[in-house]
Amino acid sequence: MIKFINILSNVISEQKRYKLSPEDYTKLLELTDRLWALRSRKIPRKIEVDQMEFKTADGSDAKVRVFLNPRYKNYAQMDLKPRTTRNPQKFVMQLNPKLFGSKKNLFLTLYHEFMHGTDPNFTTRANEKYWKDYDPTVDEKYWGHPVEFRAVTNEFLEGLVNEFKRRNQRVNNVEKRQTLLMSLKNILNYFAKGEPLTRLSLDIINRISDEGLKDTRIANLLADISTDYPETSEFMNNKEPYYLKLINTIKKFNSDMWPRFLKMLYDTVEEINNIINKGT
């Protein structure tokens, strides 16, 4: 049985990955489509391009205004405006369209920010004690804080599910589905037992965000060779993927909360197992 530390009492206590409602998930996909369509448009200054209503994890009504800002130094950030407010209707998010990279990366970045937006610790449950140890300029107080643990782990697990779904839809025989299941088990054992990752598992984690993949038809066709023919992954570059570095950073600064991630991962693996075994 997993023993949770006291600090987790300040976090929504779901033991599985947090999922947006089907309605909010659809809205997020649509928002991703609209923002992706703007990636090549010349935007000289910060402009408001969208709004989205959603629900927080405690059921409160929330809304975010979405801005594109080509001068913003980071990829994206969701915050409350004014910062002193705790009204979930007052979220503002800005993104730098020059940093979008891939469409998968854009979606998962938005997903990460909405994990913050749905977290009542930003709004209806905000308190000084919870935030006093949070400092984005200090690794231990940023990566080691429960608010980033929640956002990063849910972002990764959502991406993992989506990547296995995508690959499962492209395979056409039982043998290839068994290969996917073996990689899924390998990824679980890597995080739980330190088992080395196979080349295919590395490729799967790398494709979660299409890290470094150029936005061209040829680049996507070449990248999908290992998707359609998993055995070719043995010839792929085995550099450490971004999400592997990210989750290992979370582990480094959240050793007490790490068992919670493993429980979330185990449940997610079961979810993916069911998807693959159904062949859909």
PLM features: residue spans?
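Active-site scaffold of zinc-dependent metalloenzymes
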Residues: 65-104, 114-121
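Proteolytic processing junctions in secreted/extracellular precursors
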Residues: 3-15, 30
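Pan-zinc metallopeptidase signature
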Residues: 153-280
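Post-HEXXH active-site segment of zinc metalloproteases
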Residues: 104, 120-148
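Zn2+-dependent metallopeptidase catalytic core
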Residues: 25-60, 114
